[in-house]
């Protein structure tokens, strides 16, 4: 008995611990009861908000739209503020890391490299003084020319030999040029020589000699110019480069022969030779082409007195051959002659598209050769204003079509006619 009671007494403590457990379990479900109170409060607040919302005299869709717009505006403002703050932080960080390098660059742009800071900035960016100077110094190589000079004391003649040119730049689409050389003595530009055109080459060999009749006593005040051009059949010829020789620096005790680098030519204005006005009329049924030389103006002064004695030659040409030739009367001592002289040529209709009319204004000289002031041609393979004039004539048969034309240098027109055969 004693042992049984003793066992019951020992079992009592565990019983008390088991009985204590339920209260701890009872406290846990109490929290949901507290959450339910919060939900009731939220539902009451929601109900109150909806009641107030219902009092507003607007349909539900309008309220929803207003709410969406308001939310979008708030989000946009927040995004802009965040972006602005981040941008400021980045700029400050860059300024600290680079030590104001950008500020120096701006100053470099404004001051164009006048201070030591600009030089330091160049060093930072990897540019050196040599590299800076190389940009404007990118001088294009223009090639070189070989020539010879001699003087014939018995005949008072300067002998200029154009031997060859080399390493010329390519000015044509095919990677070549069509070079030729103009030779003249300054200050007198009236007498000019030129070599033959050499096709599609950058190393032309000319081997041509030209003679200038100049007394030795006057030679020292003159300058020889050798200008290399690229021939262009459709437009003005491009100058490649030139070389000038002052005659007072040449020793004419022996023949001079040397290579010299071509230099960039000064852009000289096209010498104004004057303008000429003439009319064209074609009658297809009769095969008759009529050219009326009306007048010329602002002609180049050719005589010592500052005037000229101009007259006009008209050539009918086909395939480089002169078929017919006409000329006007000579007008004395004038740079603005008036002619109004008519000339007719027989040209069958099937040939009218193949012929050319070449108009040349010349200065009459009693002694010596008559010098050409300038010329122009219309018809087959003409371009620009000359082509328009010819086209207008063909488009208006039996009607005279008058037009002004600018005179061009004789050598340029002759070169174009030589190609356009």
UniProtKB/Swiss-Prot annotation:
Q: What's this protein's name?
A: Synaptotagmin-1
Glycosylation sites per record: 25
The places in or outside the cell where this protein is found are: Cytoplasmic vesicle, Secretory vesicle membrane; Cytoplasmic vesicle, Secretory vesicle, Synaptic vesicle membrane; Cytoplasmic vesicle, Secretory vesicle, Chromaffin granule membrane; Cytoplasm
- Where Ca(2+) 2 binds, per the record, is at 171-172, 230, 232, 238
The C2 domain is annotated at 141-260, 272-405
Instruction: From the record, give the transmembrane residue ranges.
Output: 61-81
Which species does the entry assign this protein to?
Anser cygnoides (Swan goose)
Q: Which GO terms describe its cellular component?
A: axon; chromaffin granule membrane; cytoplasm; dense core granule; plasma membrane; synaptic vesicle; synaptic vesicle membrane
Instruction: List the biased-composition ranges (Acidic residues).
Output: 119-133
* Family, per entry: Belongs to the synaptotagmin family.
Residues reported in the UniProt entry to bind Ca(2+) 5:
303, 363, 365, 371
Membrane topology recorded in Swiss-Prot or TrEMBL:
Single-pass membrane protein
Query: Which keywords appear in this protein's UniProt record, sorted alphabetically?
Result: Calcium, Cytoplasm, Cytoplasmic vesicle, Differentiation, Glycoprotein, Lipoprotein, Membrane, Metal-binding, Palmitate, Repeat, Synapse, Transmembrane, Transmembrane helix
Cofactors required: Ca(2+)
Give residue spans on the Cytoplasmic membrane side: 82-421
> InterPro entries in the record, alphabetically?
C2_dom, C2_domain_sf, Synaptotagmin
């Amino acid at each position: 008995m004693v042992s049984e009671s003793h066992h019951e007494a020992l079992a009592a403590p565990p019983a008390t611990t088991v009985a204590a457990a339920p209260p701890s379990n009872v406290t846990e479900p109490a929290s949901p009861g507290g959450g339910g109170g919060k939900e009731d409060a939220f539902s009451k607040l929601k109900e109150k908000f909806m009641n107030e919302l219902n009092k507003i005299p607007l349909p539900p869709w309008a309220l929803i739209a207003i709410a969406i717009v308001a939310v979008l505006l708030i989000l946009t403002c927040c995004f802009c503020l965040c972006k602005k703050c981040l941008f400021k932080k980045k700029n400050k960080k860059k300024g600290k890391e680079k030590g104001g390098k950008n500020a120096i660059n701006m100053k470099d742009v404004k001051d164009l490299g006048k201070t030591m800071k600009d030089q330091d900035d160049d060093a930072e960016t990897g540019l050196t003084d040599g590299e800076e100077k190389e940009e404007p110094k990118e001088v294009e190589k223009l090639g070189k020319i070989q020539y010879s000079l001699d003087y014939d004391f018995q005949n008072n003649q300067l002998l200029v030999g154009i031997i060859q040119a080399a390493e010329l730049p390519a000015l044509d689409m095919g990677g070549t040029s069509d070079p030729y050389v103009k030779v003249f003595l300054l200050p007198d530009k009236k007498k000019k020589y030129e070599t033959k055109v050499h096709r599609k080459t950058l190393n032309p060999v000319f081997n041509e000699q030209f003679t200038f009749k100049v007394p030795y006593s006057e030679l020292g005040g003159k300058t020889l110019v050798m200008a290399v051009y690229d021939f262009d059949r459709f437009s003005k010829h491009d100058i490649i480069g030139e070389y000038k020789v002052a005659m007072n620096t040449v020793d004419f005790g022996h023949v001079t022969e040397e290579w010299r680098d071509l230099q960039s030519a000064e852009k000289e204005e096209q010498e104004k030779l004057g303008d000429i006005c003439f009319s064209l009329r074609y009658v297809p049924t009769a095969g008759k082409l009529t050219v009326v030389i009306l007048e010329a103006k602002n002609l180049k002064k050719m005589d010592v007195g500052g005037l000229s004695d101009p007259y006009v030659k008209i050539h009918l040409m086909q395939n480089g051959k002169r078929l017919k030739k006409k000329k006007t009367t000579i007008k004395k001592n004038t740079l603005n002659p008036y002619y109004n002289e008519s000339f007719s040529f027989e040209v069958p209709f099937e040939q009218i598209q193949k012929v050319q009319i070449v108009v040349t204004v010349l200065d009459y000289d009693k002694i010596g050769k008559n010098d050409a002031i300038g010329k122009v041609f219309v018809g087959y393979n003409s371009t620009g204003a000359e082509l328009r004039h010819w086209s207008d004539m063909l488009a208006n048969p039996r009607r005279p079509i008058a037009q002004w034309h600018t005179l061009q240098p004789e050598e340029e027109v002759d070169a174009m006619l030589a190609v356009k055969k």
